[in-house]
Amino acid sequence: TKSGAITNPDFEFLARQFIASTGSRIIERAKAIEETFGVKTIELVVAGFGGALIPDALREELENYFNGNKVLGIEAAALTNHETTVVNYTPQVINVAVQIVTTLKSKEQFENAIANLLSPSAKFEDGTTYRWQFGGLVPRAILIANLFDVDPVNVKNVILTTPAVDIILGDRSLPNIGTISVTLVES
């Protein structure tokens, strides 16, 4: 494993491997952005497991890990003279309103499909590749296809009214589910 950070991918990898004072890893997603706060700075945007926001004290631990802290006797993991500032990702709340023409009677499986898809932790079927990237796009077509996939035989039509357009995530954003409104129309 790596023990020091030089490149942005190094910072991202080491953030995900970091063991906090809690005794466990706390970072699921990380994105390093150079020179946000001036020359020789790294902004490390982080998301906890399941899209959790990281508390101040744990972000400070991660900063001490990268920057070092002589008072606490912590050697810097950053091998360059960059100062690392750790910030939480920005949850991009996405509300969903949809009408589904189907023979199915329960909304729960559709609500679960939406909630699982619009999670910062959502992955493709390979189980390793994250579906959503910082600064990426959340296409309506993916939401619609995901709902058809709940039961391709019994779902006849999906009418997505919210969101009305594809969602563009900010550079520091990942999707988070807002309110879900599913209306079933018997076919």
Model-assigned labels for residue ranges:
Residues K2-G136:
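Carbohydrate-recognition loop of C-type lectin domains
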